[in-house]
Every structure is written in C-alpha cells, then in structure tokens.
C-alpha cells in the first residue's frame, strides 16, 4: 500500500519528503506515510482475520497483504478499488493545496474484505 500511495503522490508532482504530520528528516516518504494512515484499518482487518498471533509473516500472508490492493473500499459513498480510492484522496489533497481552501478530503471507509468487482 505504501508503494501505491508513494507512486500516486509522485504522479501528482508532490514531494514525498514533506509530510503533513510525519516530519522525520530520516524518512524520505513522510507524505506517503500521512496519506497511508486512513488505509491502515484495511491492513489491520486482514491481519486480524487471517494471521494468527504466533504466526510469522509467511509467503501466503504476504500474498494476501499484496492482494489488498484489489479489495473493495468505500470512497465518497461509492465502491472503488484501493488504488483508485488512494488516487481520489490525493486528488482531494491537491484541491486543498492548489486552491488554498480546505474542502473535506475524500477519505476511505472500511467495508468487509472483498475483491473489487470491475465493470
């Protein structure tokens, strides 16, 4: 997820090192970490449902975590894939930056884990 967020931010011309809340000089992806925060419950839900407390991060668990990019999530009351929800959030951030006004950001809403159905 962090890589998808970072690529989307870079595609919109934003500097990843300048965060909103994260501000470590040693972290080159402060902004990506800020934008990633609303998507953290998606990972938490997967871990709670699929990985036992004493289990190591197995290859199958890693595949499952990677597959979260293909999951469904609500964005602006519509079902979207996670990468598109990330893009919508970045677009709303760009509006706030470019027009010096603070409209509500398009934050994701967690839904039960399911693969996104493309039309």
Residue positions per predicted region:
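N-terminal intrinsically disordered, cationic/polar leader segments
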Residues: 2-119
């Amino acid at each position: 997820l962090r890589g998808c967020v970072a690529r989307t931010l870079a595609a919109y011309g934003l500097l990843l090192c300048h965060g909103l809340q994260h501000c470590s000089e040693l972290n080159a992806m402060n902004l990506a970490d800020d934008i990633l925060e609303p998507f953290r419950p998606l990972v938490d839900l997967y871990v709670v449902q699929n990985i036992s407390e004493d289990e190591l991060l197995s290859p199958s668990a890693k595949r499952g975590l990677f597959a979260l990019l293909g999951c469904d999530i609500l964005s602006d009351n519509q079902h979207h894939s996670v990468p598109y929800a990330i893009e919508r959030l970045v677009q709303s951030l760009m509006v706030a930056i470019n027009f010096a006004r603070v409209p509500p950001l398009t934050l994701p809403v967690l839904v039960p884990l399911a693969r996104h159905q493309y039309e």
